[in-house]
Amino acid sequence: MLETFTNDTNEIQGRLSAWLIKHRLAHRPLGFDYQGVETLQVRSEDWLSIAVALYAYGFNYLRSQCVYDVAPGGLLASVYHLTKVQSNADQPEEVCIKIFVSRKNPKIPSVFWVWKGADFQERESYDMLGISYESHPRLKRILMPDSWIGWPLRKDYIVPNFYELQDAY
């Protein structure tokens, strides 16, 4: 199964991708962004083991985590930007990890226990697009009221006709 996900001859393989292949960690190289940051696709079921391996490799800083809706009725994508912070590093190594999940059952293992900075970022992603981060210690709405129905940043979200406004406190 590893070979079918990692060995695509049309993809450009970077240094981190080669390291993951060497350690038999399934992923798909997606190339490089405009700044030369390697982008990799990882399956949801492989994400936690790869996250731990990346932390052990030296990616000790979760710079950002975000989510986007790929297309109405299509997949949702969770994106992690990791940085290898070291002393005396002028240009720290970076990587971008993308995880695509079905909107019908969007579940991704939480990396809160690897990078504590994932706490509010995963909660915001849950609140806005409904991705459930499994084993997150406080996965609940952070921006919207608890009574809010639906996921407001999904492209197929239907805006309700009536909003009940509450006083700010």
UniProtKB/Swiss-Prot annotation:
Which Gene3D superfamilies does this entry report, sorted A to Z?
A: NADH:ubiquinone oxidoreductase, 30kDa subunit (3.30.460.80)
Q: Which InterPro entries match?
A: NADH_DH_suC (IPR010218), NADH_quin_OxRdtase_su_C/D-like (IPR037232), NADH_UbQ_OxRdtase_30kDa_su (IPR001268), NADH_UbQ_OxRdtase_CS (IPR020396)
Question: SUPFAM superfamilies from the xrefs?
Answer: Nqo5-like (SSF143243)
Keywords, ordered alphabetically: Chloroplast, Membrane, NAD, NADP, Plastid, Plastoquinone, Quinone, Thylakoid, Translocase, Transport
Cellular component (GO) terms are:
chloroplast thylakoid membrane
A molecular-function term among this protein's GO annotations: NADH dehydrogenase (ubiquinone) activity
Question: What is this enzyme's catalytic activity, as reactions?
Answer: a plastoquinone + NADH + (n+1) H(+)(in) = a plastoquinol + NAD(+) + n H(+)(out); a plastoquinone + NADPH + (n+1) H(+)(in) = a plastoquinol + NADP(+) + n H(+)(out)
Q: How does the protein's chain sit in the membrane according to the entry? A: Peripheral membrane protein
Say which enzyme class the record assigns: translocase
Supply the EC number(s). 7.1.1.-
Q: Where in the cell is it found?
A: Plastid, Chloroplast thylakoid membrane
Provide one Gene Ontology biological process annotation: photosynthesis, light reaction
Signal sequence annotation: none
Q: What is its main location?
A: plastid
Q: Which Pfam families match?
A: Complex1_30kDa
- Identify its protein family: Belongs to the complex I 30 kDa subunit family.
- How does this protein assemble? NDH is composed of at least 16 different subunits, 5 of which are encoded in the nucleus.
Main function: NDH shuttles electrons from NAD(P)H:plastoquinone, via FMN and iron-sulfur (Fe-S) centers, to quinones in the photosynthetic chain and possibly in a chloroplast respiratory chain. The immediate electron acceptor for the enzyme in this species is believed to be plastoquinone. Couples the redox reaction to proton translocation, and thus conserves the redox energy in a proton gradient.
Report what the protein is called.
NAD(P)H-quinone oxidoreductase subunit J, chloroplastic
Organism of provenance: Anthoceros angustus
